[in-house]
Amino acid sequence: MERKISTPSLFLLIILVGFPQISETIYTPSLPDITNNLHASSNMVQLTLSIYFLGFAFGVFCWGRLSDSIGRRPAMLWGILVYGIGCLGCYLSDSVEWLLLSRFIQAFGASTGSVVTQTILRESIDGTKRHAVFAQISAALAFTPAIGPLIGGWVDQSLGFKAVFFTLVVISVAIFMYTFVSLPETRVSTPSNINTLSVAKRLVFDIRIWAFGFLIGATNGILFSYYAEAPFIFIEFFHMAPGVFGFFGVFVALSSILGAMLSKRLLTKFPAEKIILIGSMVTTLGAVCLTSFTLYGVNPSVISLSLMVAFIFTLLLGIGIAIPNCLSLALVHYSDVLGTAGAIFGLGYYVVVSLITSGMSYLHNGSLVTMPIYFLILAILMVLVSKKIIVNHKTK
């Protein structure tokens, strides 16, 4: 039964939870250009993606806590304002160090779109319908990481990488205005003295929280590590123009959309826990194929490109199947402290994302084999965690 809470439109929710992902990937076609123009190493420039998730992790904690104390709407608006300041800093950056700092601020603000929106969804919709809504949003959000490179590739090719960051400034203003006009307050009451340490203790001693934190962190880590590596694979190895690469990302995003649609359909036959295991196994299959293919040897031909895309498609398909169910199930036992629990949980899994993307940045050596092996290790761990903790715990 649904609680009688004012719920924003699905379109607004998709925008609010999606703009942080666009901000993460919009400049990925520009990574080679940024490397050259700021006279930095490719490893250093890739850290601008990892630092984004670190800022995101701390922001999730901050805005989640604030949303419990000052309300969902004010927390969202203040976060978007900070995000806009970070976008302006990125535009004005003339060194990689300044860019790293601005990316941290940008991510800190953008994180409100993730944690507060998820809190709104969890407190306003119950049960199987909540799983279905998360699947719908996940299907729509599969486009947002791809929309970023599509816009960024075209803008970079036409106007240069600086214009990409100016585009984000414009987006931040537009989102702030739309949110100010359209977002209602959804918190039904002011919580009395929520003890953060008490909530943290509940989370720390909950084995399922650790499992869901790893699974959400690993799936996002794989996804955004791919977006960090993809420009160097497709632009430098396969000699794609930035604009073509940006459009190419939309095709890859179809895997995540199809995965979310399959997840919604599978919910009529299987429990959500089982679907998480299925998604992890599909991701592992894609990682095995991709690793075997790159170990065999890849050349910059149409056939090699097609096979690589097919294997990446399979890998991301599994992520699309698993992740909406992880997000929906993670905090079902914390409805009394959703904002604070979401803040702490989000801090944890975004630290995992940051560590995984940092690992990819550290391991980057120009070889096509590195990324698939890295993904294979993570995918195998996902299967083990899904089977041993999520599914077995549900059975018991």
Model-derived segments and spans:
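Conserved MFS/SLC helix-loop-helix module at the cytosolic interface between two early adjacent transmembrane helices
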Residues: 58-96
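Paired small-residue
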Residues: 82, 86-89, 97-105, 306-311
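Helix-loop-helix hairpin linking two adjacent transmembrane segments in secondary transporters
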Residues: 98, 135-180, 247
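Juxtamembrane intracellular "pre-TM" segments in multi-pass secondary transporters
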Residues: 1-3, 184-212
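Helix-breaking motifs and short loop linkers at transmembrane-helix boundaries and internal kinks
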Residues: 37-39, 71, 92-98, 109, ...
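Extracytoplasmic
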Residues: 8-42, 226-231
